[in-house]
């Protein structure tokens, strides 16, 4: 059953969470809450992977071979309602920062972040011909939502980081 994790997978997830917590504290400042609760699972009625975050807590479906989702949801502890003015109208800010931060953490952990960035670029090229003028118009599917809100935003942040340098950009983010 893909919704059940082995004890070894849970140990690996705990190690990754500890690494991510230390990395994000070093990059963005102290963990902003008193405790952190991480749970794993799937949406009970569908068995589909569940990813959900709130202040001091996140739930994920563990992925084999990558800790991206774990790092992304953990990054939301710094970038959930702390960056955007509204998680409804400005959710792209929270998602872009969490995606960008997850890739930085993957890189620091020795995981393959380059392939993730390449996939972002390919996705962005795939929808480049489409026109999105208005924020309040529905997108044409979940993939487009992911590309626009998660990936394009993260690519924008990466461009800023590359333009000013990682240290300078991290200083800016910490100050923001």
Pin down the residues of each PLM region.
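Extracytoplasmic/secreted proteins, especially bacterial periplasmic and envelope-associated proteins
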Residues: 12-19, 23, 69-73, 77, ...
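Short linear capping/connector segments at secondary-structure termini
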Residues: 38-43, 121, 173-176
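Intrinsically disordered, low-complexity segments enriched in small/polar residues
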Residues: 29-31, 130, 148, 174
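Juxtacatalytic substrate-recognition/specificity segment
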Residues: 1-90, 139-143
């Amino acid at each position: 059953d893909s919704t059940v994790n082995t004890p070894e997978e849970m140990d690996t997830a705990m190690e990754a969470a500890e690494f991510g917590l230390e990395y994000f504290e070093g990059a963005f400042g102290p963990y902003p809450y008193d405790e952190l609760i991480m749970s794993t699972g799937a949406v009970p009625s569908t068995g589909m992977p569940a990813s959900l975050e709130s202040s001091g807590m996140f739930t994920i479906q563990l992925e084999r071979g990558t800790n991206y989702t774990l790092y992304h949801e953990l990054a939301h502890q710094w970038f959930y309602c702390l960056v955007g003015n509204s998680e409804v109208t400005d959710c792209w800010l929270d998602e872009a920062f969490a995606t960008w931060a997850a890739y930085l953490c993957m890189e620091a952990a020795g995981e393959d972040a380059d392939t993730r960035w390449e996939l972002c670029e390919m996705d962005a090229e795939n929808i480049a011909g489409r026109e999105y003028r208005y924020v309040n118009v529905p997108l044409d599917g979940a993939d487009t939502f992911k590309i626009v809100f998660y990936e394009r935003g993260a690519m924008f942040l990466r461009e800023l980081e590359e333009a000013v340098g990682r240290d300078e950009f991290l200083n800016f983010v910490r100050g923001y």
